[in-house]
UniProtKB/Swiss-Prot annotation:
Swiss-Prot/TrEMBL catalytic activity: N(6)-dimethylallyladenosine(37) in tRNA + (sulfur carrier)-SH + AH2 + 2 S-adenosyl-L-methionine = 2-methylsulfanyl-N(6)-dimethylallyladenosine(37) in tRNA + (sulfur carrier)-H + 5'-deoxyadenosine + L-methionine + A + S-adenosyl-L-homocysteine + 2 H(+)
UniProt-listed PANTHER family: CDK5 REGULATORY SUBUNIT-ASSOCIATED PROTEIN 1, MITOCHONDRIAL TRNA METHYLTHIOTRANSFERASE CDK5RAP1
Cofactor binding note: Binds 2 [4Fe-4S] clusters. One cluster is coordinated with 3 cysteines and an exchangeable S-adenosyl-L-methionine.
Gene designation per UniProt: miaB
Quaternary organization: Monomer.
Family, as annotated: Belongs to the methylthiotransferase family. MiaB subfamily.
EC number of the protein: 2.8.4.3
Annotated protein name in UniProt: tRNA-2-methylthio-N(6)-dimethylallyladenosine synthase
HAMAP family, alphabetized: tRNA_metthiotr_MiaB
Stated role: Catalyzes the methylthiolation of N6-(dimethylallyl)adenosine (i(6)A), leading to the formation of 2-methylthio-N6-(dimethylallyl)adenosine (ms(2)i(6)A) at position 37 in tRNAs that read codons beginning with uridine.
Length: 444
């Protein structure tokens, strides 16, 4: 008798941490005999790996569940799982069960490694499960990691966050900060390099505070030194960096390590000291501007990107003007801009001075117009230069072109053969757009 094919599809929402979680769940399922499929209609298991940083992300999940309900009606044996940060919030798992009773499994951030076993139990018992445990359990090592997916890979170095910014739900759903042992991180990086990976991105909610809980003297600068020493590795990236914890030692370390890319994602969130204090960010605009100057002094040509929130409770027009002024001063290469979204359970959600959506939308529009003009001007200044690009594969918008990224994290689109995927090539930049540049490969 031929065994039934076991298939799965994971749909990921949110940040790189979620992308890495999804990779881990895929590895666990493949080790359990499942195979990934491209289309939801082909899947015996569908998993939504969720984000709850903003209300919009949660609404996308509820919308997707509505679409998947039709598949469940056509195939009652289909297992539907909702996993990740959204589920970890108090009361949300029960809310999902009420709104979407056809969901079979609700799985918290601290229980993802139990996924294959839980799916088999659900298939055998025909009974839904809610498994939402402590999000601050010990770091689990030696989970299966299948062959690398191309030349790039994410490597988690910390879990959780200790900062408790007043707008942010992450510490409540990811738990307190826990660092992985450096030897386990280096082991994983070496294994990835042996499989053909040449670029790793080190992941954490705040990579700059890596090692504080290990009590053996290791910090993020020291970890970067060790990763930089791995033979065969060509590039190191890292996200996210908290400005408060970006030490002078870290700046100088990054400046002299040849594999660390010349790009820092440095979320500022606001340009007003009053709003930064209300957010509990732990730094001032003056500190941030000094840090930017220090980075540019030590690392010529560095690109800087950031996150910005408009419409935080109590934000006045003068506060918002401070944000516009900071953006104009720093000249970010790119910025991820958002309207403030109240998150239940956070301090900011109950602050006085909640702003109307119309004001938030108007401020977001002005901020985006300013930043887009800066991004375009900075990209136009690069036209004519020759840059190193790691080819990531066919362009999503034009499959006949290749796409890749420079060391400064610029997205480059250029003609070339798909066999170059995973290779480092030289590209001369010929045209600039707001979000990307176009170019031509240089022979040899």
């Amino acid at each position: 008798m031929v065994k039934a094919r076991k298939t799965f599809k994971i749909i990921t929402y949110g940040c790189q941490m979620n992308q890495r979680d999804s990779e881990m769940m895929a590895d666990l399922l493949q080790d359990a005999g499942y195979e990934p499929v491209a289309r939801e209609e082909e899947a015996g298991v569908i998993i939504l790996d969720t984000c709850c940083v903003r209300e919009k992300a949660e609404n996308k999940v509820y919308g997707k569940l509505g679409q998947i309900e039709k598949l469940k009606s056509a195939n009652p044996d289909l297992v539907i799982a909702v996993a990740g940060c959204m589920v970890q919030q108090p009361g949300v798992a029960e809310k999902i069960r009420q709104q979407a009773p056809y969901v079979d499994l609700l799985l918290g951030t601290g229980n993802l490694q139990e996924l294959p076993q839980l799916i088999e139990e659900i298939k055998a018992m025909h009974r839904p499960r809610i498994v939402v445990g402590e999000q601050e359990g010990p770091v689990v090592e030696d989970l299966p990691r299948r062959r690398a997916r191309g030349a790039q890979a994410f490597v988690t170095i910390t879990y959780g966050c200790n900062n408790f910014c007043t707008y942010c739900i992450v510490p409540y759903v990811r738990g307190r900060e826990r660092s992985r042992r450096p030897e386990n991180i280096i082991k994983e990086v070496k294994e990835l390099v042996d499989q053909g990976v040449i670029e790793v991105t080190l992941l954490g909610q705040n990579v700059n505070s890596y090692g504080r809980d290990l009590r053996d003297g290791i910090n993020f600068a020291g970890l970067l030194e060790r990763v930089n020493a791995v033979e065969g590795l060509k590039r190191i990236r890292y996200v996210t960096s908290h400005p408060r914890d970006f030490t002078p030692e870290l700046v100088t370390t990054i400046s002299r390590l040849d594999k660390v890319c010349e790009h820092v994602h440095l979320p500022v969130q606001a340009g007003s000291n009053r709003i930064l204090e209300l957010m509990h960010r732990g730094y001032t605009r003056e500190h941030y501007l000094e840090l930017v100057a220090d980075l540019r002094r030590h690392i010529p040509g560095i690109s800087l990107t950031t996150d910005l929130i408009v419409g935080f409770p109590g934000e006045t027009e003068a506060d918002f003007e401070d944000t516009l002024d900071l953006v104009a001063r720093v000249q970010f290469d790119n910025a991820f801009t958002f309207m403030y979204s109240p998150r239940r359970g956070t301090e900011a959600a109950t602050m006085p001075g909640q702003l109307p959506t119309a004001i938030k939308k108007e401020r977001l529009k002005r901020l985006m117009e300013l930043q887009n003009s800066i991004s375009l001007a900075k990209n136009e200044a690069l036209v004519g230069q020759e840059v190193e690009v790691l080819v990531e594969g066919p362009s999503k918008t034009d499959p006949d072109q290749l796409s890749g990224r420079t060391r400064t994290n610029k997205l480059i689109i250029f003609p070339g053969d798909q066999s170059l995927t995973g290779r480092l090539v030289r590209v001369r930049l010929t045209r600039a757009q707001t979000w990307l540049l176009k170019g031509e490969m240089v022979d040899g």
